[in-house]
Structure formats: C-alpha cells, structure tokens
Amino acid sequence: MRRQPAKVAALLLGLLLECTEAKKHCWYFEGLYPTYYICRSYEDCCGSRCCVRALSIQRLWYFWFLLMMGVLFCCGAGFFIRRRMYPPPLIEEPAFNVSYTRQPPNPGPGAQQPGPPYYTDPGGPGMNPVGNSMAMAFQLPPNSPQGSVACPPPPAYCNTPPPPYEQVVKAK
C-alpha cells in the first residue's frame, strides 16, 4: 500500500511536467475551417496535423555568423603567417640616375619668354595685370635677382658613391 502513493505522486508529477512543457500551437485550414493541433517545443509544424523534429541549427543565426567569422579569421591568420614565413623576394631595382637640366640664359628684352602671360614684363607681350590683384602680387620686378640667376651645376660628388667610413673618420 505504501508503494501506491509514490506511484500516484510520480504519475501526477509526470502529468504536471507534460502540461507545463513549452508547446507550439499549430493550425492549418481544412476546407474553410482552421484545424488546431499542438506540437512539442523542439518540433516544427508542417501542416495537416504533423509535427516534424527540426534541427534548429538553421535558425541559429549567431552560430552561422560566428562560424563565418572564424573561417575569415583563420584565413587571415594563415595569410599573415605565410607572409612572415615565406616573404616575397626583394626585387633589385635598376640604378636610379638623376639628370639635372640648366635653365636657358635670359634672351634679349624684346624676345617672348615661355610661360603664363602674368609672369612677363609689364611692358612686354601678355595681358595687362592692372585690374588683377593676384597677377600684381605674383609679378617680379624686371631686374630682380630671382628672374635672372641661372642655377649652378650640381656638385661633382652627387654622381659618385659615398666615401668609406674609415676615410671619413680619419679625415676628422
């Protein structure tokens, strides 16, 4: 007799768990009227009173997001590790020569010089900059040192390699 109340309590507890378990209320139309049925929480409704156990991984968007982020991270890390372990070979560049050009000497006062008209002599050919304050600001006087000085040639040591360290230290 003592076992009977334990069985009844277990049965009532099982019924209570069955009733309180999360369930899905599903419905479908049969003719013109809806028909209702219940599926468990881990099942999906499929219509016509059937419940399908669904693998809910397709509904876990965060799982797919983290999976894609992990794949991208691994690919990026592999790329950087490969670049560090096997660096690309250095390409030898051809010797870089710098050539200097001299400005031609100033021609006579009547010859036209190339360049924008505002930078010419006010009495020479070109536009008259009287009404233009910007042209007046950038105009050079006719006998200014900036307009008539030719650049000197570059020093001779520019095209040679630097002297050795010992020679420089001994010179001091």
UniProtKB/Swiss-Prot annotation:
Q: Keyword RNA-binding on this protein?
A: no
Q: Does the keyword Membrane apply?
A: yes
UniProt keywords, alphabetically: Cytoplasmic vesicle, Endosome, Lysosome, Membrane, Signal, Transcription, Transcription regulation, Transmembrane, Transmembrane helix
Give the highest taxon in the source lineage: Eukaryota
- Cellular component terms, GO, for this chain's entry? cytoplasmic vesicle membrane; late endosome membrane; lysosomal membrane; organelle membrane
Region annotated Disordered, chain positions? 102-153
- Taken from the record's topology, the Cytoplasmic segments are 82-172
TM region(s), chain numbering: 61-81
| Database matches in InterPro entries | VOPP1
Q: How does it sit in the membrane?
A: Single-pass type I membrane protein; Single-pass membrane protein
Spans of biased composition, class Pro residues? Answer: 104-119
Q: Tell me the leader sequence span.
A: 1-22
Give residue spans on the Extracellular membrane side. 23-60
Localization of this protein: Cytoplasmic vesicle membrane; Late endosome membrane; Lysosome membrane
State one molecular function term (GO). enzyme binding
Q: Which residues form a coiled coil?
A: none
The Swiss-Prot or TrEMBL record describes its family as follows: Belongs to the VOPP1/ECOP family.
Relate the protein's function as given in its record: Increases the transcriptional activity of NFKB1 by facilitating its nuclear translocation, DNA-binding and associated apoptotic response, when overexpressed. May sequester WWOX in lysosomal vesicles and thereby regulate WWOX role as tumor suppressor.
- Oligomer status and interactors: Interacts with WWOX (via WW domain).
Under what name is this protein listed? Answer: WW domain binding protein VOPP1
